[in-house]
């Protein structure tokens, strides 16, 4: 199959109804705080009229219909951006529970989940995750992070799973701090859309 490589934005890759898979032979999630901080600062420096470039990604179609792609290069960045999207949904959900724009934020939560994190399956009547990680990380990603559940004991997690959780915690804290004086679901959604 033909391999594609291009410069793309988060919106162009995730808001297209396609799914992405990390091949089982790819390394575990390994980004750490330095990488998360670099990405966070890159995002904060995006001019208002521009979008963030994900950087270079290499994708290979999994099948002839091209509705699913293998991530040959760029899985660490795409995984991290997916975690950032999860942190956005978690903060919007928190605000909704706190009574901040409750109905609007419920809608935002559902739409962001559908748009960035999963494709709606008519047969299952549920969301199928857009991202499948490697065998060591996928179960944790789908069972804990996608469901916005916090592990009871972090010490029992594999090192790469701890990094996934720590990335989520890092971005949730950054978003809370960034929007603490302006708890606006509209502004938080706009922030996500420019990535």
Regions found by a protein language model. Give the residues of each.
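Glycine- and hydrophobic-rich flexible loops that cap the catalytic core of alpha/beta enzyme folds
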Residues: 1-195
């Amino acid at each position: 199959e033909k391999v594609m490589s291009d410069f793309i934005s988060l919106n162009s890759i995730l808001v297209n109804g396609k799914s992405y898979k990390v091949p089982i032979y790819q390394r575990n999630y390994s980004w750490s705080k330095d990488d998360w901080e670099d990405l966070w600062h890159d995002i904060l420096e995006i001019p208002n009229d521009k979008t963030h470039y994900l950087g270079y990604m290499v994708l290979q179609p999994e099948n002839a219909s091209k509705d699913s792609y293998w991530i040959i290069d760029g899985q660490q960045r795409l995984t991290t951006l997916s975690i950032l999207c999860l942190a956005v949904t978690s903060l919007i959900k928190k605000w909704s529970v706190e009574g901040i724009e409750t109905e609007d934020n419920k809608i935002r939560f559902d739409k962001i989940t559908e748009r960035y994190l999963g494709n709606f399956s008519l047969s299952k009547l549920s969301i199928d995750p857009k991202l499948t990680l490697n065998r060591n990380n996928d179960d944790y990603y789908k069972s804990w992070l996608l469901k916005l559940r916090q592990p009871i004991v972090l010490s029992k997690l594999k090192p790469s799973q701890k990094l996934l959780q720590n990335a989520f915690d890092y971005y949730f804290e950054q978003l809370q701090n960034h929007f603490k004086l302006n708890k606006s679901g509209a502004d938080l959604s706009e922030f996500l859309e420019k990535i």
